[in-house]
Amino acid sequence: MSSTTQWENIYHGLDTTPGKLRMSQGGLGWKPSVGEGSTITIPADQMASFQWIRVARNYQLAIYLNKDRDAPSSAQTNPRRTNFDGFVRDDFDRLSSHIRQYFNKPLEAKEVSTRGWNWGQAKISNHDVQFLVRDKLAFELPLSHLANSNIAKTEVSMEFLNPEQQQPGANTGTSDVNGTKSRRSKGDQLVEMRLYVPGQAIKDDGSDAASAQDDDVNNEETAAEAFHEALKSKADIGQVAGDSIVVFKEVLVLTPRGRYDIDVFSTFIRLRGKTYDYKILYSSMNKLFLLPKADEIHVMLVIGLDPPIRQGQTRYPYLVLQFPREEEMDAELNLDEQTIQEKYDGKLKKRYEEPTFRIVTNIFKVLSGQKVATPTDFESSSGQTSIKCNVKAADGNLYPLEKSLLWVSKQPVYVPYSEIHQAILSRVGGAVASSKTFDLRVATKSGTEHTFQSISREELDRLKAWLADRKVRIKNEMAEETGGLAAAAAAGLLSDDDDEEMGAAGGADEDEDSEEDADFAADSDSDGGSPSEASSDEGEGGGYDDEGDERPKKKRKD
């Protein structure tokens, strides 16, 4: 019977619960000291090499694994490394001795740089991206955690999956309660890193047939491009290794804008464009909408994503695909009938001969497990299922669906009826009653407010009735404005009548005064002092004194 060696207070991966690590001739195992967490076992023949490194939680034993021949070749589905933290410095000799005794392999000690420099050398190994400072390791990132890589001139960005997506097998339970508790206990995590890679790299293609032009043009590439291509190759995030279920070519994606080839795999899809690539797990798809466009020529498939995909600092929580309504295609899935029946319950077909949008929607629906929401009974004044309106400076279409409002443009806005506190109907800036448009302000229970602007006045009754049927609280400020305008108009009419009567009376007095002035020209001095508001105002202004000075001069001439 082989002996067993044990270490206490050892952490596995990113787990916050310590456990016990046991090592024997047949392999090693780890289980948490408290709770009902997963037990990790690694057979001896799967361990390729061992590394000792200083980390935040004392020292780490990194175990590099042999690649499982039966597993898919994607790095994300076949982790190549597992870590155990919590060893103390004095454990090195004991651990090294037992690894050599049980597995006949050395324990390599890796030096760590503590200079704190943010410049150095980026190196890609079979398992990690390593950042070296003076040939010492500053940090390393497992390739199995890398979800995507993009390049912009001399800058290479790397995007990372969250822990649930990195190691789905490490979850301890499947219930919502356990999942919620697990998510709450997690702290900050790395989601993106950018490296500035200047300079040129010479591409060694080993071809003797290359021409002089090829040597000048094709053999040279930037160091950033070489690093980017190496990342894609090692992490399997470019042309994904393995067999895809189906590929859709040159699909127009409105958000983020561009044409992409969509590779469909069993657990994720990959969007491959000219500049950007995206890997999207089906587990991150939480909403599907199939919507007709107002032009009646195209159909949109809107996919809600959580977490959203990223393009630099821009986050895209929705993916908007557009298809011509009449476009059809023949597609054959790379699946056998047994897999379709057993794994997908017969919900997929081996061969499709249908409109493209129906094929894509059906495949995404089955693989993601999400229902597809479509417009139901709402009809606008023009017979459409949507209403044209604006959000801020962007124009788009508002779709009143059965359970939510969905505004589709560059950045869609989704508002479930259950989260609406109040819907407010108002005119633009309190415009007059003849205004042809109005605004819909939606205040949510969380305090967020969405304003859909410049909606045609003809849609008011239909939209109000639709929201009322969904038990949405409605405040119609337009009715209040109309009542206020009516009262103001009535008051205005009354004041206009009074002014006309007073004006008529004032006109008669002026005529009489003018007649008196003509008959009694000699008494003009007394007329000049007659009490009138106009004359008194002019006297206060000083104009009347000038006129009074001229009249006595005329009398002296007579």
UniProtKB/Swiss-Prot annotation:
Family: Belongs to the SSRP1 family.
Protein's UniProt keywords contain Transcription regulation: yes
Protein name (Swiss-Prot/TrEMBL): FACT complex subunit POB3
Main function: Component of the FACT complex, a general chromatin factor that acts to reorganize nucleosomes. The FACT complex is involved in multiple processes that require DNA as a template such as mRNA elongation, DNA replication and DNA repair. During transcription elongation the FACT complex acts as a histone chaperone that both destabilizes and restores nucleosomal structure.
Keyword terms, alphabetized: Chromosome, DNA damage, DNA repair, DNA replication, Nucleus, Transcription, Transcription regulation
One Pfam assignment: SSrecog
Main localization of the protein described in the UniProt heading: nucleus
The keyword Transcription is annotated on this UniProt entry: yes
Binding partners and assembly: Forms a stable heterodimer with SPT16. The SPT16-POB3 dimer weakly associates with multiple molecules of NHP6 to form the FACT complex.
Source species: Mycosarcoma maydis (Corn smut fungus)
Subcellular location: Nucleus; Chromosome
Extra remark: In contrast to the orthologous protein in animals and plants, this protein does not contain a HMG box DNA-binding domain. This function may instead be provided by the HMG box of the associated NHP6 protein in the FACT complex of fungi.
GO molecular function: DNA binding; histone binding; nucleosome binding
A single GO cellular-component term on record: chromosome, telomeric region
Region of interest (Disordered), residue spans: 162-186, 495-558
Superkingdom to which the source organism belongs: Eukaryota
Biased composition (Acidic residues): 495-526, 535-549
